[in-house]
């Protein structure tokens, strides 16, 4: 047998790529310096994988921003507005992901969506009528050649043509079938050039095959691959899947003239059953047996039990998905050994893959013995009081009274807000000064009194600024918070926090998910101090800002020893206690963010309710079910596909919900109208994930489009997400335009 991985983290052990790229964005280094630093980082990563004994090393899994965007650039799927910018290739590439606003032009970034059921986001290309698909880039060849010069014959990785078409957008009047022939020709040209450079095998990532597929989608897949595989240009083709099983196309897949198939044996419910039903002797099976999404040690006995049931003769052991979804290494963590031994980050997962391979080959007995010992004892005890509280919950605990319509009238009278009320999602820019003060406080260089004085002064400044530009519902800015999940987790029992456990979320942005180690309870009030302080500084309502239980769970590394449902209910009770304390402190508008609600929705529709929504929605309702009718509950959701779960979202029974909608062209509005959505809505009127400031009239046009679909009495005006990562000048300029546009729209009602 041999070993490999689907992909490796690219930000670097200490987020080197992030910091270098941000220097480039700030024009502190040149394009050449950025490219040189990235080349050094790739060499370092390849060397790590090689030294760990992995026999097949991937290349082109690295990206300066996003692999899906890389594929779009490679195949010339670039809007004319960006093609025409008088910029370098790299500048145009970044313009697709970040937008561009400067002397050469003004273009908006492409949409951004969640990558399947992860917290990674991909950039969504758009096929237009004038799109000419052709081989236009060279990154995949350059990186293969780089590795070859280091003595490594790597396996290049590329998004497969089916997934590329399935996850892209199409201009009205064009469809995926229109681009099959040109896309196949472009892929075959890639094959030919790689073969010429000395490559022997290419990995085509086809994660879209693990979703429910219609007859038309299966036909598209087969049409693409029958044409593509008719001439492989001498390359072996590995068709790699992950995030689930391929039950809809397995029979077709094994009959295609591919040389190898990669399947997920971790998240694929039916993968083992499918393979036991037969796997071709002339193909290699890449067995995704080490979890690429979670950070717990692999249980070797359980993995070996699965491997023993696989009838395939030619096997390569691999990760269940790319390792970009886990942190780099545990080597830089400071946990006690008794804790650390339970964790495997990306580098340690290389060891696990190698160990499993060795054990199967009659070696590795010491590794197996150590692993058995690790799993021989209970890792953590139970909180009996918490378990009893959950067991005692009844239907009434999940039901808020009175019903929405009655609450809406009560709140209208209580708050007396104007039509189209304005607010923001919660956070304001975290400047270098804010971060430096927090760090100094953590290090003990700043006293509690000094730190509190700084936070109070900063909150005062932003409360006054919001009043000055005439916002209707204010926020305190969240300057005391580092991360919307970590901040809460630090005040909950059962949580652990890594020092350097960064994971890429989008572009160069990393998140550091906490680890749910044991049962979760609230230790102390978390947000009451600063939310109530901010409310005391103004007569306007100030929103209390909380992270919801499903998002806290989804943006953490969850336990594997209890169900995620039970873990979420534990978190929900902790956040419920916080909601009630905020209300008691006089905070009458409370936002409970569920930014990641859609994220862990099963990829197959048949699993949506039983496996997820039937407990995720009640968990949210549990949090706010006992607040008074004149307390207004808001929630917020980030980049995801929401249109297919609108009724479930309405059933959360919040009073107001804000969506990301601007970057995806307000697509959700038609569905809100069709489903008679009852909750008041704030479909973000400008995209904060791009540094560009909306043009004069841009927000006005967006509001006009919203009001064409949603009754004005139901509409709130807000950005599409929090402003933590933006600069102060662009934030203030954008928000002033937002308030002006809202006032102008009111006059037209």
From Swiss-Prot:
It catalyses: 5-methyltetrahydropteroyltri-L-glutamate + L-homocysteine = tetrahydropteroyltri-L-glutamate + L-methionine. It is an enzyme of class 2 (transferase). Gene3D superfamilies: 3.20.20.210. Zn(2+) binds at residues 636, 638, 660, 721. L-methionine binds at residues 425-427, 478, 593. InterPro entries: Cbl-indep_Met_Synth_N (IPR013215), Cobalamin-indep_Met_synthase (IPR006276), Met_Synth_C/arc (IPR002629), UROD/MetE-like_sf (IPR038071). This is 5-methyltetrahydropteroyltriglutamate--homocysteine methyltransferase. It comes from Streptococcus pneumoniae serotype 4 (strain ATCC BAA-334 / TIGR4). The gene is metE.
């Amino acid at each position: 047998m041999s070993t490999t991985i689907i992909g490796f983290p690219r930000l670097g052990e200490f987020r080197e790529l992030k910091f270098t790229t941000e220097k480039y964005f700030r024009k502190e280094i040149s394009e050449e310096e950025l490219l040189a630093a990235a080349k050094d980082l790739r060499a370092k990563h390849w060397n790590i994988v090689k030294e760990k004994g992995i026999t097949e090393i991937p290349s082109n899994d690295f990206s300066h921003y996003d692999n899906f965007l890389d594929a779009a650039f490679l195949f010339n799927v670039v809007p004319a507005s960006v093609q025409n910018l008088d910029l370098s290739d790299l500048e145009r590439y970044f313009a697709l992901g970040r937008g561009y606003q400067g002397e050469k032009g003004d273009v908006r970034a492409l949409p951004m969506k969640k990558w399947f059921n992860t917290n990674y986001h991909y950039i969504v290309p758009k096929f237009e009528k004038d799109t000419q698909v052709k081989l236009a880039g060279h990154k995949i060849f350059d990186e293969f050649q780089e590795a070859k010069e280091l003595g490594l014959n790597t396996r290049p990785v590329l998004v497969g043509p089916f997934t590329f078409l399935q996850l892209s957008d199409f201009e009205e009047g064009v469809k995926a079938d229109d681009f099959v022939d040109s896309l196949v020709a472009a892929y075959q040209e890639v094959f030919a050039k790689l073969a010429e450079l000395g490559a022997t095998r290419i990995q085509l990532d086809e994660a879209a095959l693990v979703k429910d597929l219609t007859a038309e989608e299966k036909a598209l897949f087969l049409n693409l691959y029958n044409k593509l595989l008719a001439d492989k240009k001498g390359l072996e083709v590995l068709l790699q899947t992950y995030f689930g099983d391929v039950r809809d196309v397995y029979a077709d897949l094994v009959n295609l003239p591919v040389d190898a198939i990669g399947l997920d044996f971790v998240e694929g419910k039916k993968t083992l059953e499918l393979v036991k039903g037969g796997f071709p002797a002339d193909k290699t099976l890449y067995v995704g047996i080490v979890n690429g999404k979670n950070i717990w040690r692999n249980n070797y006995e359980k993995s070996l039990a699965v491997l023993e049931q696989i009838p395939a003769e030619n096997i390569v052991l691999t990760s269940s998905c790319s390792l970009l979804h886990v942190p780099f290494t545990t080597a830089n963590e400071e946990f006690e050994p008794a804790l650390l031994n339970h964790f495997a980050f990306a580098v340690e997962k290389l060891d696990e893959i190698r160990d499993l391979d060795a054990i199967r080959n009659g070696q590795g007995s010491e590794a197996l013995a150590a692993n058995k010992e690790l799993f021989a004892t209970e890792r953590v005890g139970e909180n009996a009081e918490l378990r009893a509280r959950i067991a005692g919950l009844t239907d009434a605990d999940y039901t808020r009274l009175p019903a929405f319509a009655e609450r809406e009238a009560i709140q209208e009278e209580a708050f007396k807000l104007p039509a189209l009320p304005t607010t923001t999602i919660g956070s304001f820019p975290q400047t270098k000064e804010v971060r430096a003060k927090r760090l100094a406080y953590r290090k003990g260089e700043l006293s509690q009194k000094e730190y509190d004085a700084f936070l109070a002064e900063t909150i005062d400044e932003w409360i006054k600024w919001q009043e000055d530009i005439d916002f209707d519902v204010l926020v305190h800015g969240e300057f005391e918070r580092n991360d919307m999940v970590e901040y809460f987790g630090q005040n909950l029992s059962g949580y652990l926090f890594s020092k350097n456990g960064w994971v890429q979320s989008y572009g160069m942005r990393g998140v550091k998910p906490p680890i749910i180690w044991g049962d979760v309870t609230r230790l102390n009030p978390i947000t009451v101090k600063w939310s109530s302080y901010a409310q005391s500084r103004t007569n306007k309502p100030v929103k209390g800002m909380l992270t919801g239980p499903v998002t806290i769970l989804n943006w953490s590394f969850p336990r594997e020893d209890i169900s995620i449902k039970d873990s979420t209910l534990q978190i929900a009770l902790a956040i419920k206690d916080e909601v009630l304390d905020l209300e008691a402190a006089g905070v009458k508008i409370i936002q409970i963010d569920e930014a990641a609600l859609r994220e862990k929705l099963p990829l197959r529709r048949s699993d949506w309710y039983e496996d997820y929504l039937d407990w995720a929605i009640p968990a949210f309702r549990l949090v706010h079910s006992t607040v008074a009718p004149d307390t207004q509950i808001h929630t917020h959701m980030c980049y995801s596909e929401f249109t297919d779960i609108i009724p479930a979202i309405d059933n959360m029974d919040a009073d107001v919900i804000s969506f990301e909608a601007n970057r995806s062209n307000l697509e959700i509005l038609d569905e809100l109208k069709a489903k008679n959505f009852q909750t008041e809505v704030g479909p973000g009127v400008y995209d904060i994930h791009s540094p560009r400031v909306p043009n004069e009239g841009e927000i006005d046009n967006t509001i006009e489009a919203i009001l064409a679909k949603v009754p004005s009495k139901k509409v709130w005006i807000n950005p599409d997400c929090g402003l933590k990562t933006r600069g102060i000048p662009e934030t203030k300029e954008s928000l002033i335009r937002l308030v002006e546009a809202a006032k102008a729209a009111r006059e037209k009602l």
